[in-house]
């Protein structure tokens, strides 16, 4: 569920989404009237695919792993949920399960992919904000950022989003 290719930002769908959004912003500015533009990026959803330069921002050996890689006591297994996202991938690596934690090496690989995906999107959002400024739209534009769910990175022996734990249910709104 991860990939690092030495390609430009447009080598993955989110880079193409940014390119389309910039094109649309230019059209909307030319109309000289109020507008709404929704820009939806995929990352950091699985698969954790991002250009290599974002993976290179992190030294995998220094990436911390979850300090709580176990199912909490007195929690019914059904409330933990499944990890279906990971089972949709044909992995040559380990598959996380609720019965057994993944190795530290594999955990770091997955977390590394998540970090790279977040950094990729952070950069693309920054580029979009710079474009708003260069088009002189930044002073009269409201920007709202939100995520649709949280994410387990080995915490509570979970990988993914499907659980009733706060880590999954909590989402960002900026």
Language model regions located:
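Active-site-proximal cap/lid insertion segments
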Residues: 1-16, 24-33, 38-140, 144-174
């Amino acid at each position: 569920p991860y990939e690092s290719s030495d390609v430009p930002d447009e080598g993955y769908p989110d880079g193409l989404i940014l390119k389309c959004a910039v094109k649309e912003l230019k059209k909307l500015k030319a109309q000289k009237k109020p507008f709404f533009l929704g820009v939806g990026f995929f990352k950091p959803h699985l698969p954790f695919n991002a250009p290599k330069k974002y993976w290179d921002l992190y030294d995998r050996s220094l990436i911390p792993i979850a300090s709580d890689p176990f199912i909490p006591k007195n929690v019914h297994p059904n409330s933990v949920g499944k990890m279906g996202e990971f089972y949709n991938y044909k992995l040559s690596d380990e598959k996380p399960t609720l019965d057994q934690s993944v190795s530290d090496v594999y955990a770091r690989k997955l977390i590394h992919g998540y970090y790279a995906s977040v950094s990729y999107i952070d950069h693309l959002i920054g580029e979009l904000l710079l474009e708003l400024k260069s088009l002189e739209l930044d002073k009269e534009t409201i920007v709202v950022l939100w995520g649709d769910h949280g994410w387990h990175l080995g915490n509570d022996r979970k990988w993914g989003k499907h659980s009733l734990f706060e880590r999954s249910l909590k989402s960002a709104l900026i």
